[in-house]
Amino acid sequence: MATAARQGMGLNPVTRSACIESMILRVSVVFGTALLLGCASAPARSGAPTDATPAALPASEGGPATAAVAPPPLRWPVRTVPHVDLWLHAFAMLSDDTASVPLYRRGYRDSITVLKNQRNLLTALDGNREVLRRGLQRGSYLDAQFLPFAYGSWDELRATAEQFLQWGGDVRRAPSREVAVRLQPFAALFPGSNDREWLRLFLTGVDDEGARFLLVEHQRQLRERAPTITAVDSLWQRVYRDKFERFLNNTGLRQGDLVLSLPIGGEGRTGPGYTGRVMVAVTYPARPADAAQVLYVFAHEATGALVGPAVSDNTTPAQQRAGVAAQFVSSGQVQAGAMLLARIAPELLDGYQRYYLAQSGQRVTGDVRALFDRTFTLPAIIREALARQIDIVLSGI
């Protein structure tokens, strides 16, 4: 990622997916320890994460009020996490996202800009956009997208960031080891005074954006999309979680949270969450009829870690230096999701291919599979390596 050419958000179409994979691995290392020390639970607050399925059954009618019995916890509940959306929304509004599979939902920034213009609304994030955008281009802040995963609310995230800034980024000033560990991800991402000044300005913008616009707008959209999350939850828990289960178990993903996120499109986010489980943030479709899009992006994310090794083992150092290998990673991540679905849920494959073609801006006509393979091209040797690896995972070897 350090050598990636900067473009808007900070990544060009060739290197963006390679950096995402590398980013996920680094974020897991940076945040893993922090999650073990005090981030695994958080009190419920206004705007706190919500689950699609209740955590406990109500008492039976006429029975004792205290007799409610909780069902076994869902291994992969479907959730929304407002402060994750707020944070990703802010990054999306600062980004010129021109990747072939956009880092955010296609057209997201433009749609929000139109909405705010209609309301004649200008927040601190808008007012400081150019300064923040230039800083984002210069700095290596892409990993900061994952910071909210480690916190149960915006208040907790903001308080930790403000502590970090108050102490000038010196984690040694923390009053305890636990606090120092919580500050360490910020120290890794914002080591210099210029980095911390960017973070200070960004926090101010995010806070104002949330208070004056996004959190209310977010709740409005969640109400409008309530039938969608119900459809997604039903499709996932009743049909497809079992189909994904073997792959998830054999890749260490037995427990997790499936987070529906409004700013996200075909490029999800995966990282350790404040629940102590992995969080996979995926797109939040507007219509119940599009609920399967969640499964498409989840398949893309679930297979992402297999792609880097398959590419690096089958490319030359010269190809890696020239950026060719990074391009193969980008295509490989899309192809790997298709390969997994072909094995565990072939009825989803055509929809998956159409979805990612649309994400890449392709007009879908004629032979969908041929167009998909041309758009996300891979050498046969890498394709075969990915297929073998997916077969190995599914066989439990």
In which residue ranges do the predicted regions lie?
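N-terminal mature-domain "stem" immediately C-terminal to a signal peptide or N-terminal signal-anchor/transmembrane
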Residues: P49-G168, T377, I381
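Long, mid-chain structured domain cores
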Residues: G127-T230
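Auxiliary, metal-adjacent structural segments of Zn-dependent hydrolase domains
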Residues: L214, H218-Y274, E347
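Active-site scaffold of zinc-dependent metalloenzymes
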Residues: E267-A292
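Active-site recognition of the HExxH zinc-binding catalytic motif
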Residues: A292-S312
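Post-HEXXH active-site segment of zinc metalloproteases
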Residues: P309-Q333
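Pan-zinc metallopeptidase signature
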Residues: L349-I397
